[in-house]
Amino acid sequence: MMKPPSGVFTRREALKALGVSAASLGLATLGVSRASAADKKSGDVPAEPAPPPMPTGPYTLPALGYAYDALEPAIDLVTMQIHHTRHHQAYITNANRTLAAYPEFGKLSPEDLLRNINRVPGSIAIAVRNNVGGHANHMLFWDILTPGGAKEPKGALGSRINSDFSNRDTFFREIGEAAAGRFGSGWAWLAVYNKKLFVISTANQDSPLMDGYTPILGIDVWEHAYYLKYQNRRSEYVGAVMSLLNWDKVGARYTEAITG
């Protein structure tokens, strides 16, 4: 057997020098173990350290204007719960963390920050695009959905759709194709630019606000928005979402965009 290096005690030598036998050490260890078990039974075990607090900041998760199951069967309850409380919340948490060192940007609304994305330092620009964009996009998405939908575009918005897309059927076809045909993750939008309407598509969580457009309707085509129910049938999901659009809300956003 190899001997330990000179000057290093073996366990037996250390116990001998301390005047402690291996047997007594074993009994002592057993006593500690029994005491520890007794502590656990008596509830005297120190509490686990609390997890670090979640980063706080300017953004909080908005409540929905309807129950999680209100959009069924088009969007199922579980998808809504996960989408809202986990995915949307994650964008908010990461946005607040990103802006913690930049309080001047936290004073801006998400929309104004995205409109001024060129002022954002390069070190946080991608995080702002992804997370502040994700927050703003989802706030709009939740707002323009309603159980059973809300009729059809009417008033100034309805007239503008007929003017800019020839007719409503053409508009519905174009936005449906933009949503279903978006490669990878992203969004399809109805957006206002110079008081005219455009159907556009953006990747990931990029917002039309970054390019000077004002979005008034958005369709989320990230897989987390539909995969539990529709799997790879994105076109079916897009059609279902179209039946939930709250055209009263979209019309109000259009009026604000052309008059604000």
Language-model region placement:
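Internal alpha-helical transmembrane segments of multi-pass membrane proteins, especially GPCRs
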Residues: 16-19
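N-terminal targeting pre-sequences for secretion and organelle import
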Residues: 236-260
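N-terminal secretory signal peptides
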Residues: 1-9, 13, 23
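All-alpha RGS (Regulator of G-protein Signaling) helical domain and cognate RGS-like helical scaffolds
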Residues: 58, 74, 86, 97-107, ...
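An amphipathic alpha-helical core segment
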Residues: 177-231, 237-245
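C-terminal segment of N-terminal export signals and the immediately downstream linker at the start
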Residues: 30-71
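Short, contiguous alpha-helical
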Residues: 81, 89, 128-150, 216-234
